[in-house]
Regions:
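Extracytoplasmic
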Residues: 106-173
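Phenylalanine-focused residue identity feature
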Residues: 14, 35, 80, 94, ...
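Extracytoplasmic ligand-binding sensor domains of the Cache superfamily
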Residues: 54-129
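Alpha-helical transmembrane segments of membrane proteins, especially the N-terminal anchoring helices
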Residues: 1-28, 148-188
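A sequence-composition feature that detects small, non-aromatic residues
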Residues: 8-9, 27, 48, 65, ...
Length: 188
């Protein structure tokens, strides 16, 4: 009987590990897909823009941030648009735009440094803890660089929350625990 209980417990732990990995991979893939489509949308807007001054540039960046936030997936927490380098900033006087300034510190300097070295438009991923609750909510910051001939380069970041996936995993853990208890009662 003890062997059966230990086997059931080990199978439950292994199943939880596999399920957790699968759920987190799906959440990551969904975030990357959403962010990729958002980047394509922003790049099209930049390519179509014909700006003549700093005020127009600032207005476009603000509009892009609002559009990205409203068209993003349901787990999109915030959008952050920043200039790529200080030289461009001095020329245009661009003020960074954020739809959720409370979490702008989650865009790390190490991620920005990796992106500064990029010239191929890759999408960067950084897991984070969003300080909403004690212990934080799992999430991720995704970032990429887009550019336009008349405006230079723009760093685009998006913060995604994995709170719903975390809740689903907690419910699965509770259900598996209940099954183990029921199994031990039936066997014992």
């Amino acid at each position: 009987m003890l062997v059966v209980l230990l086997t059931a417990a080990l199978l439950s732990l292994f199943s939880m590990y596999v399920i957790r990995g699968s759920v987190l991979k799906q959440a990551t893939d969904d975030s990357r897909s959403d962010f990729s489509s958002q980047i394509v949308r922003v790049q099209k807007h930049l390519n179509a823009s014909n700006l003549t001054g700093t005020d127009q540039y600032q207005q476009l960046v603000s509009n892009l941030a609002s559009e990205l936030q409203s068209n993003g997936s349901s787990n999109l927490v915030g959008v952050y648009l920043m200039e790529r380098d200080a030289a461009d900033s001095a020329e245009r006087g661009f003020v960074p735009v954020s739809t959720e300034p409370e979490y702008s510190n989650l865009v790390s300097s190490s991620m920005r440094n990796r992106m500064r070295a990029d010239t191929s438009g890759l999408i960067y991923y950084q897991p984070v803890r969003i300080p909403r609750t004690s212990g934080g909510t799992p999430g991720a910051v995704l970032g990429s660089v887009i550019s336009s001939n008349n405006m230079g380069s723009l760093e685009v970041f998006a913060l995604y929350s994995y709170q719903s996936q975390q809740q689903a995993l907690s419910q699965i853990q509770i259900n598996m625990l209940m099954v183990c208890v029921a199994l031990s009662v039936l066997i014992g």
